[in-house]
Amino acid sequence: MTKLREDIRNVAIIAHVDHGKTTLVDELLKQSHTLDERKELQERAMDSNDLEKERGITILAKNTAVAYNGTRINIMDTPGHADFGGEVERIMKMVDGVVLVVDAYEGTMPQTRFVLKKALEQDLVPIVVVNKIDKPSARPEEVVDEVLELFIELGADDDQLEFPVVYASAINGTSSLSDDPADQEHTMAPIFDTIIDHIPAPVDNSDEPLQIQVSLLDYNDFVGRIGIGRVFRGTVKVGDQVTLSKLDGTTKNFRVTKLFGFFGLERREIQEAKAGDLIAISGMEDIFVGETITPTDAVEALPILHIDEPTLQMTFLVNNSPFAGREGKWVTSRKVEERLQAELQTDVSLRVDPTDSPDKWTVSGRGELHLSILIETMRREGYELQVSRPEVIIKEIDGVQCEPFERVQIDTPEEYQGSVIQSLSERKGEMLDMVATGNGQTRLVFLVPARGLIGYSTEFLSMTRGYGIMNHTFDQYLPVIPGEIGGRHRGALVSIDNGKATTYSIMSIEERGTIFVNPGTEVYEGMIIGENSRENDLTVNITKAKQMTNVRSATKDQTAVIKTPRILTLEESLEFLNDDEYMEVTPESIRLRKQILNKAEREKANKKKKSAAAE
């Protein structure tokens, strides 16, 4: 008879971005009294990174533990976005079941689908929590049917299809086993009880030889590299001599210097851990994800964890613009390279490859969001850098060149569906499904080449007047579609001079396109200051001041009225980029520029390119 550790449950929480997963975990922490009463719980307690709190997305997987009626429930928070899919797969290895959180109105979404597929493939036991049941537009019955359909589509087995459902409103701290909002009670007990009753307890084989697999990495200045993982069997104590089986097949011996267990949101030092525990372990500097820790006299590595390959790459380079070094703290190639290498310590879905120049690196990741978060994080830390336009990674599969395709789900008011369908068809998208969801809304599902989506979201938002919602996630690699897809249809307005932008110049340039800078902004030759309304690039002088001829004209300029400029965010700037442009990123500014700043040199290079293409 297999012994079980009935005092532990290991679960992962899965949800689409913004379906209330982090709020739900906060409520579980609060109601299990795991957090110290004196400490006021911050909202979104599990999102520790500023960017996560601002954007309402979870990037790094977090783990926390709550105690309920003598059982310890280890909860792994998963990123809801497929760009962070590398993390998702590894978390699934650490748990025995998943809690799927779905919005009672929105239902299942593409990212939910990605994460859920990974969970079902690992034979994990699912529980469904229908959240936001208090919404006036909630449609719990239909949503549960949608979840069931999704499970069937993803190949769930019969046991997985018998999932229990709990209805909740995490923000109000209520839950119930009934789908009637009137039956909600101010307690999370139904969720706790369902987890304990349905999620299997880990096997207790703590008397067998030790096996721990590292699923996540962390870094701490005091103890160095920390491996986070599950004890699959055996017992480990501080001071033990153990062996690390590396990914390349070699082994290294080390001594366990510290062990940490998870309590609430804290890590606390512990002296020993047994099979079924989730722990953090230190003592080995070059420990990596997927490696196995075993006793020195019984080395037996677990199968290596597969990590999703990157699908998108871009060039990162040292800032060499005329304004380089003005606003950032870290500007040299050595500092930028050190920072990228440090990111590799914890982000295993990222790749950084050197190029033929010491000032440039090819950085590959899982998608635009993955890379833009890295750029934004570096910018906040005081780095200056430039990046090129993102491009997809082409892979050879069975001798055929293949490119990544994404599954796109769009919710839009009916009147815009025609333009959305047309625009995605132009980007070589194939429509898989179209459903009227009521209230004049339509849901469209497409399969689109990933390069067709680079730069699409800005166009999509203006096309649907901001009412459309688009979600997309990597689907598969398919043979490359020949020809250009997507890209910008309009040229850039490029500054021909150095100086400050003036209201007088902006007034005369406005009719040529959309301006990106305010009067008084410093510009340099070759900097992009707007978007042309035509296809070609146009060089303009935005620094020209009005010639004053007499006293009366001096005040006349003050009445000049110009349109509010369109200030681009980091994501919009990335989307705007063309192949011959860079985005310059500093702690204070985001600027777009031509790779070749001088107009005459640019024209010479373009001529060369055209004649080479004609040959």
Residue spans for each PLM region:
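Structural and coupling elements of P-loop NTPases
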Residues: 1-615
